[in-house]
Amino acid sequence: MRLFVGLGNPGTKYQGNRHNIGFMVVDEIARRHGFAPWRRRFQGEASEGTLDRERVIVLKPATYMNNSGNAVQDAVQFFKLKEADVVVFHDEIELPPAKVRVKVGGGIAGHNGLRSISAHIGNDYRRVRLGVGHPGVKELVHAHVLNDFARSERSWVEALVDTVAENAALLVAAKDSAFQNKVHLAMQAKGFADNGGEDKQN
């Protein structure tokens, strides 16, 4: 069994924010793969389905980003999951737009959603880091992630969300390198190759 967690803030005010790309991804995973209707559970919204013959719960915490760990802990305890069973999809400013990297454990690079999850369940869960780019200076980061994607960005955002959802079964099977590869090649084929910049996070 796997728990897929999309990070974001609840409500229409935030739904187009860069910080909410995790919500966008799990919404598309549930839609594309015919998961059950969303319902209120675990201090958030949850849906359930099957990927790669494995039961998968997708969760969108309704606790706001800074308290995401409360919802994740509820689900982990209910299903008696290990950290390795948890996959968190989140925005990553230290990656260029449209770039995706998967990592296990490590630093949180100031991401309050990850900080909360690590405080509640430990640090050795898997993270799917969805590049949204950096505004250039630290002082602009808060506004950058809490602003909507620009109109000019929407085409690559839609392509990335679709591509990640399409290949989500590889994450269930813990084939993280294959997942990264598939997403990269698919985005290239769609004309949205990342800029090749190396990530700055451990």
Swiss-Prot record:
Site note Stabilizes the basic form of H active site to accept a proton, residues: D91
UniProt site (Discriminates between blocked and unblocked aminoacyl-tRNA): N9
Family matches, as InterPro entries: Pept_tRNA_hydro, Pept_tRNA_hydro_CS, Pept_tRNA_hydro_sf
Record key words, sorted: Cytoplasm, Hydrolase, RNA-binding, tRNA-binding
Domain of life: Bacteria
Record-annotated active site: H19
GO molecular function: peptidyl-tRNA hydrolase activity; tRNA binding
Location of the protein in the cell: Cytoplasm
EC number: 3.1.1.29
Reaction(s) the record says it catalyses: an N-acyl-L-alpha-aminoacyl-tRNA + H2O = an N-acyl-L-amino acid + a tRNA + H(+)
The keyword Ligase is annotated on this UniProt entry: no
Entry's Gene Ontology cellular component terms: cytoplasm
GO BP annotation list: protein quality control for misfolded or incompletely synthesized proteins; rescue of stalled ribosome
PROSITE patterns on file: PEPT_TRNA_HYDROL_1, PEPT_TRNA_HYDROL_2
Chief location: cytoplasm
Binding site for tRNA: Y14, Y64, N66, N112
Disulfide bridge positions per record: none
Assembly description: Monomer.
Role: Hydrolyzes ribosome-free peptidyl-tRNAs (with 1 or more amino acids incorporated), which drop off the ribosome during protein synthesis, or as a result of ribosome stalling. Catalyzes the release of premature peptidyl moieties from peptidyl-tRNA molecules trapped in stalled 50S ribosomal subunits, and thus maintains levels of free tRNAs and 50S ribosomes.
Protein name per UniProt: Peptidyl-tRNA hydrolase
Species, as recorded: Nitrobacter winogradskyi (strain ATCC 25391 / DSM 10237 / CIP 104748 / NCIMB 11846 / Nb-255)
